[in-house]
């Protein structure tokens, strides 16, 4: 019966949940169909609204999460009413979870489509996606809101090919008294120079990220994706704006569009309204040109799911035969030996909001598309601790995770020869590096490899020092707010 219901068109369009629906238990209003993946702060499920038959996405967020950030995300979505921004329908509290009901985009994110097809987008396809995305950004910026995490993984497509901005977990609101923000937040490779430098930024920070996203859609990954993100953090503000790896492959209009986005000075960078008038965007074709790549991606995903299901069924048969063989005097040990059964899951842990992933895709990839197999994979979506943690930039969370991985990988290994002596770690006076000439190539390579963990450790120490100064101020502000509320 459920399949028939899904094939029928919605009886009427769901615009917002009414008061009667919001007073009921969510299970009375929705049928949860399947888990789609993990987004910022919670798990995302596909569900059907019983009254209208409309498919929706439901983000289930543990109450132990950072409620302030979640409320901010809801607040921003609630204020938005644009066909180019994912719609918000309402929220429920259920046991220890907050259920956030949102618009469902069946084709997934642009980065999902690239990975599923193993193919980047053409210029025509990119222009169409950018046109809708710019309309969404124009709307947000008119509302004085900054998305702060624009990338291919946060641009969702519905099955008709309409692009919508999603995942407002790190979005910010600009007020009249706060012309620029100073918070470092976003994904390293997509971040604007002024965001990294913490010199204050406004809505055009999203335009820089959009330029990086245009390169990502064309080449499969953002600039600097091949290097350590810590180095990228230092290179983005100091190096000239990035360009295509092979500029000769792209038209002058597309190249100029990216150039207009990637202007280092925010004051001279184009706005969303201005870029909508750019020849590359104005000549964009209709959304119908995206339907073929959407259908191709969905077919690939369906075939992979069918293949995985066959493997699961085959494993079940093999295990059943083993059970019959073990029914004699031999008793089967229960424990680690049970690892032959595979879980029938089609979603990775690293999926973004309302984005369906196939479990054969790289896990925890976020949105950065890597064309070669031996490169590192990054993203913004990280699992968060259930306990409350001080806010920190997402790229620092990434560095901490990498540091833990490095420590695990290096456990039991000896320290490289020239690095055993603590004096070798000191910064030479007056930049005198003559002593390096006496080292072997192997020793120099070991020292180079050791620099990144050192840098990350120093950054973490600075962050902790800053947090120790910041937290008492935040506590004092919160205490004053509580006293004002009591009055």
From Swiss-Prot:
PTM: Autophosphorylated on serine and threonine residues. Phosphorylation at Thr-387 by PKB/AKT1, leads to inhibition of its: kinase activity, nuclear translocation and autophosphorylation at Thr-183. It also diminishes its cleavage by caspases and its ability to phosphorylate FOXO3.
Positions annotated to bind ATP: 36-44, 59
GO molecular function terms attached to this record: ATP binding; metal ion binding; protein serine kinase activity; protein serine/threonine kinase activity
PROSITE patterns found in the cross-reference section: PROTEIN_KINASE_ATP (PS00107), PROTEIN_KINASE_DOM (PS50011), SARAH (PS50951)
Biased composition (Basic and acidic residues): 303-312
Any one cellular-component term (Gene Ontology): cytoplasm
InterPro entries, alphabetized: Kinase-like_dom_sf, Mst1_2_SARAH_domain, p53_tetramer_sf, Prot_kinase_dom, Protein_kinase_ATP_BS, SARAH_dom, STE20/SPS1-PAK
Source organism (scientific name): Colobus guereza
CDD domains assigned: SARAH_MST1 (cd21887), STKc_MST1_2 (cd06612)
Protein name: Serine/threonine-protein kinase 4
PANTHER family, sorted: STERILE20-LIKE KINASE, ISOFORM B, STERILE20-LIKE KINASE, ISOFORM B-RELATED
The protein's role, per its UniProt record: Stress-activated, pro-apoptotic kinase which, following caspase-cleavage, enters the nucleus and induces chromatin condensation followed by internucleosomal DNA fragmentation. Key component of the Hippo signaling pathway which plays a pivotal role in organ size control and tumor suppression by restricting proliferation and promoting apoptosis.
């Amino acid at each position: 019966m459920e399949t028939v219901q899904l094939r029928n068109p919605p009886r009427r369009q769901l615009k917002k949940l009414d008061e009667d629906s919001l007073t009921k238990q969510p299970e009375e209003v929705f049928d949860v169909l399947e888990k789609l993946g993990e987004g910022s702060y919670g798990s995302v499920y596909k569900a059907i609204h019983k009254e209208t038959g409309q498919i929706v996405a439901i983000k289930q967020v543990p109450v132990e999460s950072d409620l302030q950030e979640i409320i901010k995300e809801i607040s921003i979505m609630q204020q938005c009413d644009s066909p180019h921004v994912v719609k918000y329908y309402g929220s429920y509290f259920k046991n220890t979870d907050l259920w956030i009901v949102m618009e469902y985009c069946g084709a997934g994110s642009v980065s999902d489509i690239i990975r599923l097809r193993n193919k980047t987008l053409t210029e025509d396809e990119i222009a169409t996606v950018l046109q809708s995305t710019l309309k969404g950004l124009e709307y947000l910026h008119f509302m004085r809101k900054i998305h702060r995490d624009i990338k291919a993984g946060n641009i969702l497509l519905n099955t008709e090919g309409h692009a919508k901005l999603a995942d407002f977990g790190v979005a910010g609101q600009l007020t009249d008294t706060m012309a620029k923000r100073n918070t470092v937040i976003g994904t390293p490779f997509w971040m604007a120079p002024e965001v990294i430098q913490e010199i204050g930024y406004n809505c055009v920070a999203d335009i820089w990220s959009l330029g990086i996203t245009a390169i990502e859609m064309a080449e499969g990954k953002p600039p600097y994706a091949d290097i350590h993100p810590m180095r990228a953090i230092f290179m983005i503000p100091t190096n000239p704006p990035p360009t295509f790896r092979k500029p000769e492959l792209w038209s002058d209009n597309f190249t100029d569009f990216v150039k207009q986005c990637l202007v280092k000075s925010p004051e001279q960078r184009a706005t969303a309204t201005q870029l909508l008038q750019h020849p590359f965007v104005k000549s964009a074709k209709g959304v119908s040109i995206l339907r073929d790549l959407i259908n191709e991606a969905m077919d690939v995903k369906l075939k992979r799911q069918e293949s995985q299901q066959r493997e699961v069924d085959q494993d079940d048969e093999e295990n059943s035969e083993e059970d019959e063989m073990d029914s004699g005097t031999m008793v089967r040990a229960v424990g680690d030996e049970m690892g032959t059964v595979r879980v029938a899951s089609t979603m990775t842990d690293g999926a973004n909001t309302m984005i369906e992933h196939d479990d054969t895709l790289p896990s925890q990839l976020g949105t950065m598309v890597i064309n070669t197999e031996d490169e590192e994979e990054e993203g913004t979506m990280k699992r968060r601790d259930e306990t409350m943690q001080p806010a920190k930039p997402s790229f620092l969370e990434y560095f901490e995770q990498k540091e833990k991985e490095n420590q695990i990988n290096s456990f039991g290994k000896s320290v490289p020869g020239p690095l055993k002596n603590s004096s070798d770690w000191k910064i030479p006076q007056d930049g005198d590096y003559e002593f390096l000439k006496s080292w072997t190539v192997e020793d120099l390579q070991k020292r180079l490899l050791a620099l990144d963990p050192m840098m990350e450790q120093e950054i973490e120490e600075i962050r902790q020092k800053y947090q120790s100064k910041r937290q008492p101020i935040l506590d004092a502000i919160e205490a004053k707010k509580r006293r004002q509320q009591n009055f």
